Amino acid sequence: MESTLQAEAPSKRRGGEFAAVPLHADEVRSALKTVIDPEMGLNIVDLGLVYDIEVNGGDVEVQMTLTSPGCPMGPYILSESKAAVESIDGVVHAEIILVWEPFWTSDRIDTRVRSLMGL
């Protein structure tokens, strides 16, 4: 289940000044679409690796998985995911939680992308 909670968070911009900036799970999802799985050549959202996004003020928690427990690019993908979320104006803290249930299968790939891939 995905959170669409809107919260007020301090802005990290404007040279230390703070301003209320509403954060949305959709903004987090958009930022995560910039993270590409190097082995698959697709972003982690369209791959279906992002399971849940929770926004609470300036804190963001993302539950995600990898294509396999032995994914050699796992540390890179997790690090890039955290950096992408932390780059959003208003995010103070990002936590990326790696989960293995439900286990990822190619059925989780976005239907539009699956169609383009011929799956």
Feature roles, as predicted:
Residues 1-119:
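Domain-level signature for proteins that mediate thiol-based redox and metal-cofactor handling
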